[in-house]
Amino acid sequence: MNPVIKKFQFGQSTVTLETGRIARQASGAVLVTVDDDVSVLVTVVGAKQADAGKGFFPLSVHYQEKTYAAGKIPGGFFKREGRPSEKETLTSRLIDRPIRPLFPEGFMNEVQVVCTVVSTSKKIDPDIAAMIGTSAALAISGIPFDGPVGAARVAFHESTGYLLNPTYEQLQASSLDMVVAGTSEAVLMVESEAKELTEDQMLGAVLFAHDEFQVVINAIKELAAEAAKPTWDWQPKPEATALLGAIRAEFGDAISQAYTITVKADRYARLGELKDQVVAKLAVEEGSPSAGEVKAAFGEIEYRTVRENIVNGKPRIDGRDTRTVRPLNIEVGVLPKTHGSALFTRGETQALVVATLGTARDAQLLDTLEGEKKDPFMLHYNFPPFSVGECGRMGGAGRREIGHGRLARRSVQAMLPGADVFPYTIRVVSEITESNGSSSMASVCGASLALMDAGVPMKAPVAGIAMGLVKEGEKFAILTDILGDEDHLGDMDFKVAGTSKGVTALQMDIKIKGITEEIMEIALGQALEARLNILGQMNQIIGQSRNELSANAPTMIAMKIDTDKIRDVIGKGGATIRAICEETKASIDIEDDGSIKIFGESKEAAEAARQRVLGITAEAEIGKIYLGKVERIVDFGAFVNILPGKDGLVHISMLSDARVEKVTDILKEGEEVEVLVLDVDNRGRIKLSIKDVAAAKASGV
């Protein structure tokens, strides 16, 4: 096959799609190049036969950043790439979410997508190129896929409006970082963080992106017209109409009744009993449907029952209407020895959230293609199996936990104080202790509460809510605060977080076509109503950050020294600063501009370290009055300590206007006395006076 190349202009960049030159044994392979900044090789392979033992669609997406792409060699002992980074995991999820709904219902053949960043200039994020490449590779692979999909990143500035596919530098000054993906007809996925933008501004960004990425879809269609392989001859299994009818006729009412049981565990127990009865009755003899087929049909009846009830205006599974938030129970300060804690319960979803403050040394070190950087804010989300009443694997964070943690982080990050105001490293951990829908948004609420309980000066409280959608024909219902079952059986998962003034994060995943601007607008308005309701209840418990940090949190003292003194504080080979830290039990961070942050487990430890630093760096100011302590008396005067490690001499002639025969007639060792600095010679010797203090005070010194 000869290489096929398509070029098109996409915002401020030229994008090139090339196939037929690299990875030709894959079902589909496309090399995406954006200007000369980014190149991503995307391959798609589909298994020709489905694995009969799998009852789900085995799609896997692997996004990987090779260090050679940025001209680097991996650090560490093993000089090769290791396990996926958090960025790679999040981007894999970002690519997966818009393509998964476009494979046909019932398609169970394994599909693997591999996106490899092979070149980057560190100007733009390669994720959009990877999403475009995935869509193009699927379009030419022959695998059944209802694409192509377009994708775009959007930034927003109050003065200039929306900006398509911004650079890293442009994102720094933006109030919005949004990624949108969809088909020519509809939006399928939104992932964003914002600085309190309005619902209209967020919706405008979604629609702007959808309009702009049509050029991507058209280019992929042109590529597929020249390079696509024949579409697989795959047909879905015919619907088991007779089996569905038999289950509905005999068990339909019982299934519908089971979905009025409000307690999840009781409802699941009843549905389990009914499923066993259905299998026992309909999968009994040879020639009848298998147990797997009966269970699948039972699940389809469940799906239709819940959806029909909702669109026809009947009460939801737990008896609520479409706009009501589940009952809230909010507590703060629940863990006595932590820096800040909150227990946030919404219905059968509960998060125990803990905030911990640390020093700059506790910041997360990130080794990315763009270079090393430190992240002073972490939010970790844990979802143990007991939260849903199950036994399960315990271990490191999975893709879902990383994704939910990042969404919660995006939601609260814009409301954190700057490093100049609050130079602590912050770690928030959300432990999901119960789950029945929207645990990530419970984490947002809990994180805001725990941070305020810890005394972190938040700009405003943040709350989050998960919305759902059920659409049958022209009928649709938008659901506030969805349950786990409503998420599973619905057509949309729409999470919105923000303050009373605006949106800080928006995540949307849509499983069907035909989500209109009207539906998104209604969902955003309904989410605002729910968010304000939750914020009102949160504010009754704690409406603003505590005035003081927890007594368990480290004490921080900030100071600045002359840059010439940095070497003195550090000492030869770091000996001086190491000795200060060991002896005072404090930690000291020094910046190149002379800024110093001292962290101590107690106020006393931090102050002791500060005094040690002052003793090394402080200089006596000529003409300034100090309260000093007489350290030593000699025949010709007295040595007075005015600063840590700084003694000056009060000559006997400078003790009093009257003649002084003996210094001890005026001063005693250990006595505190006010002195005026007269001079500091080029050897650092300080000349002091007692008799001139009164005159200096009178003149306003």
Curated annotation (Swiss-Prot):
Short name of any one Pfam family annotated for the protein: S1
GO molecular function, one term: magnesium ion binding
Keywords, ordered alphabetically: Cytoplasm, Magnesium, Metal-binding, Nucleotidyltransferase, RNA-binding, Transferase
Enzyme class name: transferase
Highest taxon of source: Bacteria
PANTHER family linked to this entry: POLYRIBONUCLEOTIDE NUCLEOTIDYLTRANSFERASE, POLYRIBONUCLEOTIDE NUCLEOTIDYLTRANSFERASE 1, MITOCHONDRIAL
Family note: Belongs to the polyribonucleotide nucleotidyltransferase family.
Protein's name in the database: Polyribonucleotide nucleotidyltransferase
Organism listed in the record: Pseudomonas syringae pv. tomato (strain ATCC BAA-871 / DC3000)
Organism lineage string: Bacteria, Pseudomonadati, Pseudomonadota, Gammaproteobacteria, Pseudomonadales
